[in-house]
């Protein structure tokens, strides 16, 4: 096979798929095999989590990141997020494991046995990186698949058993979403919101109607855009504006993935609707507000007048007013005054927290939930001795929110660097001055061996 070495491809073995830039068949094999690795990890890791799973303990105490995703989709859980059946977790793991074998076979086939280039095999699957019309057609197929993916969530929510709704009355429960939000003013209003504070841009979505309605919109938009890109050829301005090369497309993709990674970071850190706290543990603001509530309850039982007690700063010790006049929790948690959560909202009135409800109407389940969330804040250090930094070493808890937010932030940053790197190379190559490092006269080649 050609393009296995530096002489035939211009790239050394460690440059990986760069050797396959012009071998569409081999590149297909690499991508299908990569998909197989991804799906294999999903299946194997789900089964690993299930093998270690203790139904009596919260998922977030067991370091789980995959089973919570399955549970959020409404499989295997019931009222309050309690696991009622672990079999769906097993099924999801096995289905991914089996499909990864199919992908693995396809990847190996196209890497070893299949045609090196698809062009001589099929005009439909073949392509040339510089063929602008073919590239936008491929873009169209990708958009249609993404749209179908979005609509699959809609189908699960509306027709196949529903999703887990942490806001369901009487405590979270699996609920069929029968009335998704289709009003474009609501859906696109999220995109126009400020990203700061309680506004929170799209991350502020706090009900499943809006989530499912948004997926209906984005699914239909992606499918319509896909059909458009298949049927049309790029306009002159687009032909002139973009760089049309394999490396340019790589940079566009990395840029998009970077953006998605940063958005996912904010979602898993702040949003407790699509990442229910029953599965992922409390958000940072949630744990802080829960601590304020826990000690308010304790001191109120001991006789404190929580409505008028003054703290060491002269502000209210337990309750104070927000910048816009609502009654909020006092102390350091004041910065999280726009937190919303299903365990706290029943205590609100028309002007923030309702003093009458706080004095007379806090339910035992709210007290327990606040204490649980207070002690499971998403704090943690590198060596996994979690909890507050001053905590004794017997505490060993790191929230899945910490792991997921940190990993997605770091990966999103790496992808952003990769985007800039490949965009710069692609633009330089298009402008005709891209040289790279001259491998013939690379200094290291003339240096003596390290040993």
From Swiss-Prot:
InterPro entries according to UniProt: PS_antenna-like, PS_II_antenna-like_sf, PSII_PsbC, PSII_PsbC_sf
Binding site for chlorophyll a 5: 138
Protein name (record): Photosystem II CP43 reaction center protein
GO cellular component terms attached to this protein's record: photosystem II; plasma membrane-derived thylakoid membrane
Residues binding chlorophyll a 10: 106
Residue numbers binding [CaMn4O5] cluster: 345
Transmembrane regions: 47-71, 112-133, 156-178, 233-253, 269-290, 425-449
Positions annotated to bind chlorophyll a 8: 92
Subunit field text: PSII is composed of 1 copy each of membrane proteins PsbA, PsbB, PsbC, PsbD, PsbE, PsbF, PsbH, PsbI, PsbJ, PsbK, PsbL, PsbM, PsbT, PsbX, PsbY, PsbZ, Psb30/Ycf12, peripheral proteins PsbO, CyanoQ (PsbQ), PsbU, PsbV and a large number of cofactors. It forms dimeric complexes.
Lumenal side: 72-111, 179-232, 291-424
Family per similarity comment: Belongs to the PsbB/PsbC family. PsbC subfamily.
Ligand binding (chlorophyll a 9): 211
Binding residues annotated for chlorophyll a 3, in chain numbering: 27
Regions of this protein lying in the Cytoplasmic compartment: 1-46, 134-155, 254-268, 450-451
Annotated positions binding chlorophyll a 1: 418
Binding-site list for chlorophyll a 4: 30
Positions that bind chlorophyll a 13: 415
Any Gene Ontology biological process: photosynthetic electron transport in photosystem II
Binding site for chlorophyll a 12: 225
Membrane topology, record value: Multi-pass membrane protein
Binding-site residues for chlorophyll a 7, renumbered to this chain: 404
Keywords: Chlorophyll, Chromophore, Manganese, Membrane, Metal-binding, Photosynthesis, Photosystem II, Thylakoid, Transmembrane, Transmembrane helix
Annotated residues for binding of chlorophyll a 2: 13
GO molecular function: chlorophyll binding; electron transporter, transferring electrons within the cyclic electron transport pathway of photosynthesis activity; metal ion binding
Keyword Methyltransferase: no
